[in-house]
Amino acid sequence: MDLTASAAIVLSAAGRTGHEAIIERAGAIVSPDLLEDAAEAIAAPWVSTGGGLLTPGCSGWPRGLADLGPAEPCALWVRGTPSVELSRMVAIVGSRRCTPYGRDCARILAETVVGTGRAVVSGGASGIDAAAHHGALAAGGATVLYAAGGAGTVYPENHRGLYHAAQASGAVVWEFPPGSALSGRSFLHRNRLLAASSGA
């Protein structure tokens, strides 16, 4: 037996070719029931502690995420007020190392946005993001914090109070399930959701 043979050669030798053969074989290895059981095992603790799980097409799903096409997430892990309309948001994002003037501008802009009845969405980072969240909160409006990493991750750690305030006024949203590692790429994934959900 040639252990260096390609997958196409192996499938061809078995009398099958093309994508259908690969899908059929994958289905035999991982059954839909097994995947469903695994998903329920991950989601159950989250939901039992007050977390929510949104999927495309359900109430509250940000409409703009459909513009991502195949990169649209399959679920969003949420903590916060269920009444927040996640499809009526304006994104305010910027530098972590901003000037006091930039911080003031972000805060004032956020106050203006919530005055129009929309929620402010940002990424919870230091600098402009935090100023935007705080501006929305100070004006009595809703803010939605798109967080990087797995559901429940707070980064930076000293923003735990901001996460709780965002959760109380609006929502904190993660793309990945609890336990997913936080890495540099996590922020890129998060940023595409910020842009798409606000129609940027």
Regions found by a protein language model. Give the residues of each.
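Short, small/acidic-rich helices and loops at N termini and domain boundaries
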Residues: 1-62
